[in-house]
């Protein structure tokens, strides 16, 4: 079945919203400064939809479960809207959407952080937010793989791992993995 351009556009908007929701949950989990511009943006974009959900899914141990629940629901709605899938498949699709959104968020944060590190040598709050988000992921890799001069290969290693996992899930789940994100 071929999707129309409108469906692809709507899917892109849905995926972008899922990324902002993951970013919001990740910022809270990493305890990035609330007044950082990246945090402020994520909070302003997501608060209108997350505040009502917090009554159902409160924050647990610094994990914003309301954001994860909303991404789960979004994944299920995509399955209903696009393909009219059964309930069992929708539940799996919701979980896959959360997982794929987390992977995409990690990829984009690492990529943007790496690009910012090339151009920005000063004290910048946006760069610092990306540093706070990526450092817990990169620190174990840096212990195994030392930097060569001023070049840090740890973001590339994590991105290759994400690429491998994405291809593995695509081989394992096929179209369901594509629908998830």
From Swiss-Prot:
* TM segment ranges: 3-23, 67-87, 92-112, 159-179
Which UniProt keywords are listed?
Answer: Cell membrane, Membrane, Transmembrane, Transmembrane helix
Q: Report the coiled-coil segments.
A: none
Q: Known Pfam families for this protein?
A: YGGT
Q: How does it sit in the membrane?
A: Multi-pass membrane protein
Highest taxon, organism lineage: Bacteria
GO CC annotation: what is one? plasma membrane
Q: Where in the cell is it found?
A: Cell membrane
Please give the chief subcellular localization of this protein: membrane
Instruction: Tell me which InterPro entries the record gives.
Output: CCB3/YggT (IPR003425)
| Family, as annotated | Belongs to the YggT family.
Q: Which PANTHER family match?
A: PROTEIN COFACTOR ASSEMBLY OF COMPLEX C SUBUNIT B CCB3, CHLOROPLASTIC-RELATED, YLMG HOMOLOG PROTEIN 2, CHLOROPLASTIC
Q: What is this protein called?
A: Uncharacterized protein HI_1036
| Organism taxonomic ancestry | Bacteria, Pseudomonadati, Pseudomonadota, Gammaproteobacteria, Pasteurellales
């Amino acid at each position: 079945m071929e999707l129309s351009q409108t469906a692809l556009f709507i899917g892109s908007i849905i995926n972008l919203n899922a990324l902002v929701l993951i970013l919001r949950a990740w910022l809270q989990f990493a305890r990035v400064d609330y007044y950082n511009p990246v945090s402020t943006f994520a909070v302003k974009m997501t608060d209108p939809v997350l505040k009502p959900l917090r009554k159902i899914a409160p924050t647990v141990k610094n994990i914003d479960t309301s954001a994860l629940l909303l991404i789960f629901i979004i994944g299920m709605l995509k399955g209903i809207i696009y393909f009219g899938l059964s309930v069992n498949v929708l539940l799996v699709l919701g979980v896959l959407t959360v997982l794929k959104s987390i992977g995409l968020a990690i990829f984009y944060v690492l990529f943007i952080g790496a690009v910012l590190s090339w151009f920005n040598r000063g004290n910048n709050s946006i760069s610092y937010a990306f540093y706070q988000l990526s450092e817990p992921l990169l620190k174990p890799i840096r212990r195994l793989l030392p930097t060569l001069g001023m070049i840090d290969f740890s973001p590339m290693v994590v991105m290759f791992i994400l690429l491998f996992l994405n291809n593995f899930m695509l081989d394992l789940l096929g179209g369901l993995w594509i629908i998830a994100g």
